[in-house]
Amino acid sequence: MAQFIDRRLNGKNKSAVNRQRFMRRYKEQIKESVADAVNRRSITNTETGEDVAIPHKDIKEPLFHQGKGGLRERVHPGNDQFITGDKIERPKGGQGGGGAGDGDASADGEGQDDFVFQISKDEYLDLLFEDLALPNLKKNQVNKITEWKKHRAGYQTAGMPSNISIVRSLQQSLARRTAMSAGKKRLLHELELELERIQNQEPAQKLEEMKLKQEIAELRKAIESVPFIDTFDLRFKNYERKPVPSSQAVMFCLMDVSGSMDQATKDIAKRFYVLLYLFLNRTYENVEVVFIRHHTQAKEVDEHEFFYSQETGGTIVSSALKLMDEIVKARYPVGEWNIYAAQASDGDNWADDSPRCKELLTSKLLPNCQYYAYIEITRRSHQTLWHEYEKLEESFDNFAMKNIRSVEDIFPVFRELFHKETA
């Protein structure tokens, strides 16, 4: 019996290479579709992938055809309506079922749907946060040299002889030999029983006995021909070099929860911070996050309370800045940590407090921060806090401020604030 062993490395995902090539080729169109999807789905929904639509015109293959100019004569079969010299009216515009046209429906004309396919959760998040990074991330003074440490990472089918795993290789060998010879051994046992029965019969059946002995000999030879060890059985210990963290970073999230922040404004702020939190967890393994909520008083809270607490009150923004400064001094030495902050507010603040905020940022926070981002969520004209912060933007390169007017602005503003710097 013939034995077929599938040793293809691609396994169940035999079109993975074609899929990767397609995604590389149409990366820009896919990224545009993912950016549009951010506004359609909940930002916290990262358990599933996303349906991506690419306009049919963008995936057309190039082709050679005759140009529009020149004179040509053609014979169209079945014509009983036109004669030489007649001008044929162009078909009226119509769209396919999934087209994006704005014209009216028509009984004439043809169109084609957009090409739609699904990307996985990991592909969605990779595309969402591609080209983003924490600005000005520097190595701290304590860990100036990147150290590497080897970690065991399972087994692989190729490697150095010194890394061979004898036990795992013999297990693979035993499994292969069992699979390839189990059927033959079962048949051999049956033939040996049959031979014993024939040998004990009277009169002796020499011809049948010789035939069975020949079959038994061939089976034993086939069983013995199964190699004890094969290159397919070899397993090598796999080691991966992982960098010891050389850059420690902390992100402070400061959110205004005062009474002037209505529910829609708070929802936009929370969505921005959820996006920031996902970005940090997806891109960096060793970034700590400190959550601060404030109204007239500021308080450090955990992740759950930051996003779901209903506490509210008046507005004194400087309380959050003071608390951040206290936490930095107590837990995050400037020489050892890269310090970042993202502040969200509707811009409504006690008038006398806005200059105080500017003073705190100028003298205490911005000199110690790698990057400080301020987003103001409002459709109204800006107030004193925005105008004070504008002076900071002129003086400090590590300070950025943006205005968010609606949910649709969240992702574009986020990308502007954290776009990866190019060398």
UniProtKB/Swiss-Prot annotation:
InterPro entries: UPF0229
Region (Disordered): 81-111
Composition bias, Gly residues: 93-102
Coiled-coil region list: none
Pfam families xref list: DUF444
NCBIfam families: PRK05325.1-2 (NF003707), PRK05325.1-3 (NF003708)
Family classification: Belongs to the UPF0229 family.
Alphabetized HAMAP family for the sequence: UPF0229
Name listed for the protein in its UniProt record: UPF0229 protein VV1_2091
